[in-house]
Structure formats: structure tokens, C-alpha cells
A protein has these predicted regions:
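Acidic helix/loop microenvironments that form the catalytic cleft of cell-wall polysaccharide enzymes
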Residues: 69, 157-158
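Hydrophobic pocket-lining residues that define ligand/cofactor binding sites across diverse proteins
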Residues: 140
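Short beta-strand immediately N-terminal to the catalytic nucleophile in serine-hydrolase-like folds
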Residues: 152-155
């Protein structure tokens, strides 16, 4: 299960290339060479924040959190450039990665641990999305966002993941 990022005072330098969670090569990953190779890294649970400039001290912008699609097997937060959306609509846009495929939705009794409430909990991808939302709630004001005005949206499997959170007790 994801753990809270504790280094609130640390500056995390942005990556030049988007980090993808492990996935097969595909059109969604932007890497389709007809190979059976996997791309990405398990060190992939990052988010990007796009904020418009020119904010007044007391002003807070609405926040949009985007969940990428890709059948929960492929895709990543770097699929689209949300800088224009943030600037034109005066919103803060948060884009997230979450674990995919068997790393995101694999169930096995050996996965049980003292921190898990349910036996063989398998929805690690969903838990990654929930933790990203929790992080956003705790930290978005530092980027000019309004923590009381957050909209979660997604495309394809990302939209289905958003919908699944409506049924989640978390």
C-alpha cells in the first residue's frame, strides 16, 4: 500500500521525461516498437502540478486532479500537457501516476501484512489514487489551489477509476 510522503520541506526536482509505472510497450505509453518489453520503473508514484501565474495573495484557484486512461495496464501522467488548461481556465491541475497491471490489481494471500485491513487486498492502483488525493488536500494551498474545491476527472480507465471511488468507503 502507498505510504505518505513525509519530506514536506524537501524540494523534489522535476524530471525531464515523464516517469511511467511498469507497463508493456503500447500506443498509450507512446512507445510502440512491436516488442514484448516492459517500460517504466517501480519508482513511479509521482504527480505533476500545473498552476497559472499572477495569483493574488488571498486568491485560491479551483483544483482539477486528472487520472490517465490505458485499461489500467498502460499510460502515464505525461500523456497531455495541462499547462494551457491551467493558464486559460485559471485552475491548478494535478496529474498523477498509479500502479498498473499486476502491480496495481493483483491479489494473493502473501500480500497480506499488518498494515492491511482486508485479506489479499489487491487494489493498490486505487490506493495510489486515494493517497494522491490526500496529498493534494494537505498540500495544494502551497501551489495556490483551493483544497475545498477539488474535482477529480479522468479518461477511459481513468474515468472508471474515478467512478470506482464513489463506491469506496475510503
Amino acid at each position: 500500500a502507498p505510504v505518505e510522503f513525509e519530506r514536506a520541506d524537501a524540494v523534489v526536482e522535476p524530471f525531464a521525461e515523464p516517469v511511467m509505472c511498469p507497463q508493456p510497450q503500447s500506443q498509450a505509453s507512446g512507445q510502440n516498437e512491436g516488442k514484448d518489453d516492459y517500460l517504466g520503473s517501480e519508482d513511479c508514484l509521482y504527480l505533476d502540478i500545473y498552476a497559472p501565474g499572477g495569483q493574488k495573495e488571498s486568491e485560491r484557484w479551483p483544483v482539477m486532479v486528472w487520472v490517465h486512461g490505458g485499461s489500467n495496464l498502460t499510460g502515464h501522467k505525461g500523456t497531455y500537457d495541462f499547462a494551457r488548461l491551467a493558464a486559460r481556465q485559471q485552475v491548478v491541475v494535478v496529474v498523477i501516476n498509479y500502479r498498473l497491471g499486476p502491480l496495481g490489481w493483483f491479489s494473493h494471500p502473501a500480500l497480506n501484512g499488518p498494515q492491511l485491513d482486508a485479506p489479499a487486498l489487491a487494489n493498490f492502483g486505487t490506493l495510489d489514487i486515494i493517497e494522491a488525493l490526500r496529498w493534494t488536500q494537505r498540500n495544494i494551498t502551497g501551489f495556490g489551489g483551493d483544497a475545498d474545491n477539488v474535482t477529480l476527472f479522468g479518461e477511459s480507465a481513468g474515468g472508471r477509476n474515478v467512478f470506482s471511488l464513489l463506491a469506496s468507503p475510503m
